[in-house]
Amino acid sequence: CYLSRKLTALYPEVVALDLTKPEIDAPGITAVQGDVTGLRFADNAFDTVFCTEVLEHVPPEKLQQACNEIVRVASRYAVIGVPYRQDLRDNRTRCLRCGAVNPTTGHLNRFDRQRLTALFPGMTPREIRLTGRGQAVTNPLSVAIYRLCGYPYGSYEQEEGCIRCGEKLVRPKIDRIQWALCFVARALNQIQY
């Protein structure tokens, strides 16, 4: 909603789209429920498409389809915002209901400059800005310890439910041995930087 409001200073008409209809009531903004993998807009419907904090959540098998849709509806520009080289092993969660391991904050995809450019055939990047560390924030030993302990320090406060069953993610209880092991794993992560 914040970005939509800011964009009204640049564009007379703004369409705010999300999986659930955005709760925004402001002049010049039309709120729409939709899915980036199947946009219900005509070809070249928008001068500029802003797609931020979205593509990392799209299932990998639908990612190219989502990018093709952005290219299809953008008549001039597409502004894309994704985490740069995010370490998807960090902050995983485990669903207590079905046992599925979930990625951090529902992020299913990892991007670097080459991959992001390849996802948008026919578009030439005008500018690329990289933010974030762009390096691993964990290591294989820490990942193995977290997995053994059931990922107790994952991103359980995220909005997204389990990627397999949809259940709300709940932080597991851990005993003293698990706590000590996770303490060691966190320390290993800290000393690598």
Label the predicted regions.
Residues 1-90:
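Conserved SAM-binding loop
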Residues 31, 37, 59-193:
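S-adenosyl-L-methionine-dependent methyltransferase catalytic module, highlighting the catalytic core
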